[in-house]
């Protein structure tokens, strides 16, 4: 999209991550499965980030620029370059939407980025239940409560919140998962759900989830999505980060 001059441009920044997701796209240490793309090996400077972002914003109508890509770790670990970059971008233009895709592990840092001019956040979850989240994300140095706090922080700052909901039929569409997601959405500000197909062996995933929970009988993804839409009619559904003109 960046080279084609349209939609959402990536701003990869972080070589490090504080989660060890089983299906990580950019790092697989065991060799048991391969990663689909190499992780960025350096941290760009605020100036470099700003130049790329402004180039895209200035030539694309309703543009989006996003930190947190499949080819990097988590961008909250690179806030030392992201925060000044956001400030510099916003000193030059109010156009464009600045978004961050993240695991939401550091709510305090996320709050500082919002104050700098960040417009929206997409936070990844495979489950709204802590044992199931921990079994897949395998967090290092943060807890599930930090992720929830980040969602809450975005709401307090009145920023647009998307959940990057990693779903796998047979688990995601169980009554337990539906109830947990519904409870999360009633308690915290979620503006959009991005229903993301989980890039992981579904049989292996089910076994891992079954070891930490007792999944009930699946209801079907279509029914789950329909029930969420009925219960939360104001929540948007999609697959991509929207520009602020469509919040």
Residue positions per predicted region:
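Core AdoMet radical
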Residues: 8, 28-109, 115-147, 191-194
């Amino acid at each position: 999209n960046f080279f084609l001059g349209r939609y959402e441009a990536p701003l990869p920044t972080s070589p490090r991550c504080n989660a060890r997701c089983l299906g990580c796209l950019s790092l697989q240490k065991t060799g048991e499965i391969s990663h689909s793309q190499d992780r960025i090996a350096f941290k760009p400077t605020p100036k470099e980030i700003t130049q790329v972002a402004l180039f895209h914003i200035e030539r694309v109508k309703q543009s989006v620029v996003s930190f947190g890509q499949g080819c990097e770790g988590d961008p909250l670990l690179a806030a030392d370059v992201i925060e000044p970059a956001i400030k510099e971008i916003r000193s030059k233009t109010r156009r464009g939407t600045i978004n961050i895709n993240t695991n939401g592990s550091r709510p305090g840092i996320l709050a500082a980025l919002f104050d700098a001019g960040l417009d929206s956040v997409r936070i990844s979850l495979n489950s709204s239940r802590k044992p199931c989240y921990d079994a897949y994300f395998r967090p290092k140095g943060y807890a599930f409560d930090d992720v929830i706090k980040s969602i809450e922080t975005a709401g307090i700052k009145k920023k647009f919140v998307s959940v990057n909901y990693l779903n796998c039929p047979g688990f995601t569409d169980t009554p337990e998962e539906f109830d947990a997601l519904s409870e999360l959405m009633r308690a915290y500000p979620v503006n959009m759900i991005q229903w993301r197909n989980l890039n992981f062996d579904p049989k292996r995933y089910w076994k891992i989830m079954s070891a930490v929970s007792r999944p009930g009988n699946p209801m079907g993804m279509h029914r789950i999505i329909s029930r969420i839409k009925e219960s939360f009619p104001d929540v948007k559904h999609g697959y991509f980060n929207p520009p602020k003109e469509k919040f």
